């Protein structure tokens, strides 16, 4: 994959527009999970250190496009950056007609989704973004799968378009995991729905030596084996697809599960054989024997790709399966790469971030890359590198 890298450029005195992924959860005006901002800090600091005129922006939440809404302002991100950086940080609301930035100064340009045409990759808006800078740095892997004005369009018109360190590292790590993986390669796909991850399961079934399913996805596979899943979240219309995948590759289906009669944080958990799930019960986690079976598989892996928990780990009574799997990945000597919001939350909860080889900041982009889809922002950077 040939792209221009920000680290290869001299940014001194240049106007540098960094599209980061600062889409973080905010409550009462404060950032509640800073993982994405932390990941972007080295890129921002590198540009500042070189004496660039630094502009950074992102989307945050889902405001009505083209309308300012204080609830989705990047102000909490600016306040966070002020605490973390020794530099002053300014938030600029109106910037499309130009913004003054001094060398070594950082300004945050307000939420790109307040600009009409952002999501449609509007050419006029893209050109306005491009006119603000000498160098465009795409560093938001989490939105690289979307062709939008601040992730894709701007790169077509900026004088120079390059990949930031975070994006470059994501592409390198995913390339290593998917193109030439050390074997055996184990892929874990969890979460609630088969339908949203069916193409991922299909793609991974062709490259992974072992596929593991968890969460609501596993319930569909349990049903495909003829077991009653009671009131569990599963997709009846995809049982045949699950049967097809079971016939073409080795997928361990849970033999024991933790169930409850209601979906609640306080619901007591009952551990039982997968054969004994009652009509009024729902499966909320895999059982101990199933979790240990997965831990054994992971122990022998050389590459692990992890996307999604194996149970409702947010509820303490249904956390054990995901905890056993997470610790098995942490203890493994394999090259491990993890991605997706729920996966990152589990990594934080179990305190294993330093034991995962690479943590991807992307959710949808991570999955689309795994599927082998072309990411528009990356394709644009490759195209610009040829000129």
Swiss-Prot record:
Record keywords: Acetylation, ATP-binding, Cytoplasm, Glycolysis, Kinase, Nucleotide-binding, Transferase
Enzyme Commission designation: 2.7.2.3
Biological process, per Gene Ontology: gluconeogenesis; glycolytic process
GO CC annotations, alphabetized: cytosol
UniProt xrefs under Gene3D superfamilies: Phosphoglycerate kinase, N-terminal domain
Record's keyword annotation contains Cell inner membrane: no
Catalyzed reactions per annotation: (2R)-3-phosphoglycerate + ATP = (2R)-3-phospho-glyceroyl phosphate + ADP
Pathway: Carbohydrate degradation; glycolysis; pyruvate from D-glyceraldehyde 3-phosphate: step 2/5
UniProt binding sites for substrate: 21-23, 36, 59-62, 113, 146
Entry's family note: Belongs to the phosphoglycerate kinase family.
PANTHER family: PHOSPHOGLYCERATE KINASE, PHOSPHOGLYCERATE KINASE 1, CHLOROPLASTIC-RELATED
Quaternary organization: Monomer.
Protein name: Phosphoglycerate kinase
Organism annotation: Escherichia coli O9:H4 (strain HS)
């Amino acid at each position: 994959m040939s792209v221009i890298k920000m680290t290869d450029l001299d940014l001194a005195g240049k106007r540098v527009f960094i599209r980061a992924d600062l889409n973080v959860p905010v409550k009462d005006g404060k950032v509640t999970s800073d993982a994405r901002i932390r990941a972007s800090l080295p890129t921002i600091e590198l540009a500042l250190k070189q004496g660039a005129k630094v502009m950074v922006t992102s989307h945050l939440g889902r405001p009505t496009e083209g309308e300012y809404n204080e609830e989705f302002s990047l102000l909490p991100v600016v306040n966070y950056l002020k605490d973390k950086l020794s530099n002053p940080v300014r938030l600029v609301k109106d910037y499309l007609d130009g913004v003054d930035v001094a060398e070594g100064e950082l300004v945050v340009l307000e939420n790109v989704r307040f600009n009409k045409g952002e999501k449609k990759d509007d050419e006029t808006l893209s050109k306005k973004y491009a006119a603000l800078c000498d160098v465009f740095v795409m560093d938001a892997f989490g939105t690289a799968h979307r062709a939008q004005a601040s992730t894709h369009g701007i790169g077509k018109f900026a004088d120079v378009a390059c990949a930031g360190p975070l994006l470059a590292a994501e592409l390198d790590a995913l390339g290593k995991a998917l193109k030439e993986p050390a074997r055996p390669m184990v892929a874990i796909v969890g979460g609630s729905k088969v339908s949203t991850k069916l193409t991922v399961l299909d793609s991974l079934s062709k490259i992974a030596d072992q596929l593991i399913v968890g969460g609501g996805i596993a319930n569909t596979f349990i049903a495909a084996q003829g077991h009653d899943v009671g009131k569990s979240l599963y997709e009846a219309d995809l049982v045949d697809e699950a049967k097809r995948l079971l016939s073409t590759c080795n997928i361990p289906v849970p033999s024991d599960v933790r169930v409850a009669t209601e979906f609640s944080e306080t619901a007591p958990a009952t551990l039982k054989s997968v054969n004994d799930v009652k009509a009024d019960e729902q499966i909320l986690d895999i059982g101990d024997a199933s979790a240990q079976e997965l831990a054994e598989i992971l122990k022998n892996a050389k590459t692990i790709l992890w996307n999604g928990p194996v149970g409702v780990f947010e509820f303490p009574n249904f956390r054990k399966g995901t905890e056993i799997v997470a610790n098995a990945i942490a203890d493994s000597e394999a090259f491990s790469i993890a991605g997706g919001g729920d996966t990152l939350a589990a990594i934080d909860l179990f305190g294993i971030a330093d034991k995962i080889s690479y943590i991807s900041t992307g959710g949808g982009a991570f999955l689309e890359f795994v599927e082998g889809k072309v990411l528009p922002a990356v394709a644009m950077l490759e195209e610009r590198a040829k000129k």
